[in-house]
């Protein structure tokens, strides 16, 4: 395990930004929260490795968020990442950051027909078992156990070596230009988090009649509003199968819906008054968004 510095203050981060300006490329990874333990998308840790030493930045402890922006946008070094899609979305959504450069190893692996994720490219011990151990960890908790910090930094330690190996294979196969094109396309893509747009994931949605679909959409909105108000993961308010059940039973008011959701539930019990109030807001907003799409021809 390489040595690493844990960056938790603005002054430490400012010094790191100045230091990394002298580097040509840095391996980067994020640990985040995505509607698993609380509401929304959060950047919880930023892991960096310059080929010699590792750095873990705690963005929750940084007061001057512009320093985080400077780290990713004001630096000239190449950001070497693996499967950056979710990380780029999190940076953009929470911090308003769009990295100035990118080298995504997942694109290279795809072009070279090497499936299986990052652990499949590795020969070391940091494989799927280690990933599974921390897959659902709460990265918002503080202080973080040393084992979680060690795991976090381990995810970037071999990215630069992998980048060299994959770049050589791309060149050998004549795929460098195609990699550059796809890599630039991923970096330039506009990313917007739209939690209200996923109501079609409710089981059986496509088989519902029009009234059922409209009700499912309203319930999805209400679930999002309640989760945001109480800082809960939406699935801890109502699972997607529960939403489908509510539609099937024709439940219309907050009291009846909360009663169903709270069956056999000790934690995260749904407040019927809050849900009923938000359900009214959801009905209005869902109808308004449907009308807007209709006017646009969507």
Where are these regions (language model features)?
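DEDD superfamily 3′-5′ metal-dependent exonuclease/proofreading module
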Residues: 1-44, 48-298
């Amino acid at each position: 395990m390489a040595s690493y510095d844990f960056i938790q203050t603005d002054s430490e981060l400012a010094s790191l930004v100045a230091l990394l300006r002298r580097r040509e490329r840095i391996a980067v990874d994020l640990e985040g929260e995505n509607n698993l333990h609380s509401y929304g998308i959060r950047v919880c840790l930023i892991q960096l490795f310059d080929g010699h030493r590792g750095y873990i930045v705690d963005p929750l402890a940084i007061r001057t968020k512009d320093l985080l922006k400077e780290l990713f946008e004001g630096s000239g070094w190449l950001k070497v990442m693996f499967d950056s899609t979710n990380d780029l979305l999190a940076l953009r959504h929470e911090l308003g950051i769009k990295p100035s450069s990118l080298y995504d190893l997942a694109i290279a692996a795809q072009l070279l027909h090497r499936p299986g994720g990052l652990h499949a490219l590795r020969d070391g011990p940091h494989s799927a078992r280690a990933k599974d151990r921390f897959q659902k960890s709460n990265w918002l908790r503080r202080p973080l156990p040393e084992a979680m910090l060690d795991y976090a930094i381990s995810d970037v330690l071999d990215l630069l070596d992998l980048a060299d190996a994959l770049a050589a294979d791309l060149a050998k196969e004549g795929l460098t230009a195609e990699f550059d094109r796809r890599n630039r396309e991923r970096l330039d893509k506009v990313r917007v988090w739209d939690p209200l747009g996923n109501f079609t994931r409710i089981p059986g949605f496509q088989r519902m009649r029009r009234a059922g679909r409209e009700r499912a959409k309203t319930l999805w909105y209400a679930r999002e509003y309640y989760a945001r108000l109480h800082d809960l993961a939406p699935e801890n308010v109502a699972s997607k199968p529960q939403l489908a059940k509510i539609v099937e039973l024709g439940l219309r008011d907050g009291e009846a819906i909360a009663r169903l959701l709270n069956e056999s539930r000790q934690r995260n019990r749904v407040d019927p008054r809050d849900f009923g109030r938000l359900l009214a807001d959801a009905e209005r907003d869902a109808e308004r968004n449907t009308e807007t799409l209709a006017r646009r021809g969507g």
